[in-house]
């Protein structure tokens, strides 16, 4: 999961930040305003066509609250949630046709709760469960028609 956070930070640096205020991302992944103060507020980045690319909430330079990613078409791609820079809450991903393809839950930076994966047609393919980053409960796998094909119990 650290890799996802680093990827997001790298992505924002490479993409060239464009927002309502000049925001700079330092080598630690903290966001600063043009006066080099830790930034609090909403950060928005846009595609060259003017559509939003990403919108996130920051508190004292750290991602805190909702993060929304968009496809270049302007359609929503993913909603994430952070608490003090750590993954926390429900993350939902949609494909370009607007079909929900994933729902995941985190708590204090770790996988926690129910996870669901759907195919591009909206058919449930996987149901998984985590507690504090560990696999728990009954995991299920479904075929392309939605028929249960496998179950694995994790203690």
Give the label of every model feature segment.
Residues 17-155:
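Glycine/tyrosine- and acidic-biased, solvent-exposed loop/turn segments at the edges of beta-strands
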């Amino acid at each position: 999961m650290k890799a996802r956070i680093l990827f997001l930070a790298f992505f924002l640096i490479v993409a060239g930040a464009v927002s309502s205020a000049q925001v700079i991302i330092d080598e630690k992944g903290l966001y600063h305003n043009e006066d080099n103060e830790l930034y609090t507020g909403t950060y928005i980045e846009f595609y060259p066509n003017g559509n939003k690319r990403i919108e996130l909430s920051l508190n004292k330079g750290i991602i805190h609250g909702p993060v929304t990613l968009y496809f270049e078409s302007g359609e929503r791609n993913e909603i994430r949630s952070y608490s003090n820079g750590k993954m926390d809450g429900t993350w939902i991903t949609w494909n370009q046709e607007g079909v929900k393809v994933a729902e995941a839950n985190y708590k204090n930076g770790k996988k926690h709760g129910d996870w669901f994966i759907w195919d591009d047609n909206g058919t449930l393919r996987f149901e998984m469960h985590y507690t504090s980053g560990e696999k728990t409960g009954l995991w299920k796998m479904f075929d392309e028609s939605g028929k249960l094909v496998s179950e694995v119990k994790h203690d």
